[in-house]
Regions:
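Short, well-structured alpha-helical segments in soluble
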Residues: 59-72, 89-91, 259-268
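Cap/lid and interdomain-hinge subdomains that line or gate substrate/regulatory clefts
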Residues: 44-45, 103, 108-243
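Structural motif
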Residues: 51-65, 155-157
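Extended hydrophobic packing segments that form well-structured cores
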Residues: 375-466
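Long, internal scaffold/assembly segments composed of regular secondary structure
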Residues: 231, 235-323
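Short catalytic helix/loop segments, enriched in acidic residues and glycine
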Residues: 24-40
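Periplasmic-binding protein-like
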Residues: 72-82, 100-102, 271-276
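Short beta-strand segments enriched in small/hydrophobic residues
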Residues: 2-25, 174-183
Length: 466
């Protein structure tokens, strides 16, 4: 999914007031911290040690080198000793990437029997980090602050979470969204200022005529289509529901052809997310369903009915969770209908076709069923129920004067009974702290009916991204 192996620079602040021996210790301690962080196995990206920063010029130079290194996704700063914060102003003013302030110290415990003023001067992060933190706050620079000993797994976990957010921020500046169709007519929340999105978020949002992309679909060879259909038949349960087997396979093959054609178009033109709309399908024989689900599982973002904002968020949230151990999945989602029985409240989540199978719990089936919208033949889709457990639903909306990111923690549950007549993938969740409060707050905030949903991210991470 990612085209580069991102790294994070570790910048240690000090000053020349304490002498060469002290500065040698500072450098040695910083190297030990970096080596141990990398060996811990708890961080998703490599930390790179940089020489101790003690002058205005070197600080400014290092921050600009970080700006210009495409593999650097952010910097971690730490003041081992006192480091006069005015020395950091020029560098911080010009820095353009995510920033984490690690408020730690080399030693975990005060050496009660041997501590003297040399030790105090050398190990005064409690002093130096406050000086540095003050200037960052005064300059109005957004950053993450993580406090605690660097060897503590809880501290490492918070660094790891921030790293994923930082990569989301950096990748956001390169996201390219393909609009296969315009927004659904008369729908408000899927609209938005695409120019402002490029200015504020870095997103490129381009539209192409549906039939230009349909030409790529039509150009897919029969051999390639058959090979992908065979893969589907090996991976998923085939749920004929009384349909003729040959006719069923032909419908599935249409989706295979769409998957291959769409992906070739997106790879050729370097797009990372895609939107479709059932009201504008051109020469496509079916509304893309199974095809979109498969593309989402590969890491592409998706939004229904032209919802490019949600498509970009799904892409970014997939990037942020890439390589995560025991990941449970990320998907495009839509609020559909409520269960309002006291004690059993929740929202049944689904969409017409395009929920990502990364969130599936148990077997995944292929169905071909009629779709009342789109005026095309019956589309094939993957059907499943989602995993249980905590997650987040995120909605980026355009309020006219600014964008707003709305995040709700949710608790995914199993539905009480099977739903044999519902031919789509589903999730069922209760918003935190409860359905009534969550729904009221969501509506007051202007949240959309579409969301980018993930089991693997937190509200804190998405708030940091925003």
């Amino acid at each position: 999914m990612l085209k580069k192996a991102y790294k994070f620079w570790f910048l240690t602040g000090s000053q020349d007031l304490y002498g060469d021996e002290c500065l040698a210790h500072v450098a040695e301690h910083s190297k030990i911290i970096v080596e141990n962080l990398n060996r811990s196995g708890n961080l998703p990206y490599e930390v790179v040690w940089k020489p101790t920063l003690i002058t205005d010029a070197l600080i400014r130079q290092t921050f600009n080198e970080a700006n210009n290194d495409p593999d650097c996704a952010g910097v971690i700063t730490w003041m081992h000793t006192f480091s006069p914060a005015k020395s950091w102003i020029a560098g911080l003013r010009e820095y353009r990437k995510p920033l984490l302030h690690l408020h730690t110290q080399f030693n975990e415990e005060i050496p009660y029997d041997t501590i003297d003023m040399d030790f105090m001067n050398e190990n005064q992060s409690a002093h130096g980090d406050r000086e540095y933190g003050h200037i960052v706050t005064r300059m109005g620079i957004e950053r993450k602050v993580v406090a605690g000993h660097w060897s503590d797994e809880r501290v490492q976990s918070r660094i790891a979470s921030w790293m994923r957010t930082a990569v989301g921020i950096v990748e956001s500046r390169n996201v390219r969204i393909l609009r296969v169709a315009d927004n659904m007519r008369n729908v408000a929340v899927t609209e938005g200022d695409k120019v402002e999105a490029q200015i504020k978020l870095g997103w490129t949002v381009d539209a192409y005529p549906v039939n230009e992309i349909a030409e790529y679909v039509a150009a897919v060879s029969q051999a390639d289509t058959d090979a992908l259909v065979d893969e589907y038949y090996q991976m998923y349960d085939i749920l004929l529901d009384g349909r003729d087997e040959k006719e069923f396979r032909r419908h599935v093959a249409v989706q295979a052809q769409i998957e291959l054609g769409f992906e070739r178009f997106m790879v050729e033109k370097d797009y990372h997310a895609i939107v479709t709309h059932f009201g504008d399908l051109g020469a496509l024989k079916q509304l893309p369903g199974l095809a979109i689900q498969r593309l989402e599982e590969k890491g592409y973002g998706f939004g229904g009915e032209g919802d490019w904002k949600t498509a970009a968020m799904v892409r970014l949230m997939k990037v942020m969770t890439e390589g995560m151990k025991d990941a449970k999945g990320t998907s495009f989602m839509e609020d559909y209908t409520y269960n309002l029985v006291p004690g059993k409240e929740g929202i049944l989540e689904a969409h017409m076709l395009e929920v990502c199978p990364s969130i599936a719990d148990g077997p995944i089936g292929v169905k071909v069923q009629p779709l009342s919208m789109g005026d095309r033949e019956d589309p094939a889709r993957l059907v499943f129920t989602s995993k249980t457990g905590p997650g987040i639903a995120a909605s980026l909306v355009d309020l006219g004067t600014r964008f707003r990111l709305i995040i709700n923690s949710v608790d995914c549950k199993k539905v009480e009974k099977p739903m044999p007549k519902l031919p789509v993938a589903t999730a069922f969740w209760t918003p935190e702290p409860n359905l009534k409060t969550g729904a009221e707050a969501w509506i007051l905030a202007g949240g959309a009916h579409h969301t980018a949903f993930s089991y693997d991210l937190t509200a804190e991470q998405m708030g940091d991204w925003a």
